């Protein structure tokens, strides 16, 4: 989906990774968020006349298209699920605020470490980590576009994190040997992910 397109359905990522981005006419791109399995792209986007950003895939993805009728029925008959959708909207806004802080105030090393922590926590919340490891299909170009750094700077920063034994990158797998140390390096506080609101409080079956 590209900027200027007329939105119709809401996309739910069932598998794979995607991103939201803005792009200038000369091709320069700013990634403003990553979508992981279980994420909804632009809740209630169908109320807008046109897209003001683009959504691109990072890996092969499987999506479910959720219609306006679906959301109307959920809102009317399943208040717990409706609350969960509101929770996701608020968490997405909190993530966006944290990304703004990342771009404006953190150093290069802190930016990368913080982003890696966020992705690891989000994947763990979705049950997609394996001990200290998780899938990590992002390229250095993706990281550069998400953190406002050059690819050269990203490469150097990743080397620094590796040499400090904060991360291990093996192909498309990220290993975090000591999450607490990586959190400290990125000045990361997971409170903005509001993970305490996951679980039974939002269980539609209760």
Give the location of each predicted region:
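ATP/adenylate-binding site constellation spanning eukaryotic-like Ser/Thr protein kinases
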Residues: 15, 37, 60, 68, ...
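Polybasic "coupling" helices that flank or enter modular domains
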Residues: 59, 79-148
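Cyclic-nucleotide recognition modules
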Residues: 33-98
